[in-house]
Amino acid sequence: MTENYKIIGNFIKDMSSETPDTPTYIFVRDKISKYKLNIDINSKAVKNGIIEVNTILRFSDQPEILKKAHFEITYTSIVKVDEKVSDKKEMEKIILCDVPNKIYPDLERIFLNLLTDSGYPGIKFEKKIDFTELYKQRAN
């Protein structure tokens, strides 16, 4: 099947690593395996069939934990959608499934480097994110 979109660019819109102090760093270093990865995707039309797709990763502990670090990245993809795409469902699939599946390997590498460079080496996300499956679950 021919792709009905083209990613014309990607960039890091925002990136954050917050560890407030040394006691928190020591606490988090021992507990970071309990942190959860959350994903959010949003988009907005720019002009002439160009869409900005923001894929946001957040890696954090439960809200009730006081000593915690927070890691977040917003990775933006500039997407040119084929003018033949007019169906809302098809557009939704491009934004929520196709683009994230294509950019995720780079996004994960950048995010893991952020964690390593923030003093938390060796973190791996055991489960690979299947945006196709998430999209199907959302549709049901």
UniProtKB/Swiss-Prot annotation:
Major localization listed first in the record, in broad terms: cytoplasm
Summary of the function given for this chain in its UniProt record: One of the proteins required for the normal export of preproteins out of the cell cytoplasm. It is a molecular chaperone that binds to a subset of precursor proteins, maintaining them in a translocation-competent state. It also specifically binds to its receptor SecA.
Domain of life: Bacteria
Subcellular localization(s) per the UniProt record: Cytoplasm
Gene Ontology biological-process annotations: protein tetramerization; protein transport
Gene Ontology molecular function: any one: unfolded protein binding
GO cellular component annotations of the record: cytoplasm
Upper classification of the organism: Bacteria, Pseudomonadati, Pseudomonadota, Alphaproteobacteria, Candidatus Pelagibacterales
Extent of the signal sequence: none
The keyword Transport is assigned to this record: yes
Name the record gives this protein: Putative protein-export protein SecB
Pfam families found in the cross-reference section: SecB
Keywords: Chaperone, Cytoplasm, Protein transport, Translocation, Transport
Oligomeric and partner information: Homotetramer, a dimer of dimers. One homotetramer interacts with 1 SecA dimer.
Record-stated family: Belongs to the SecB family.
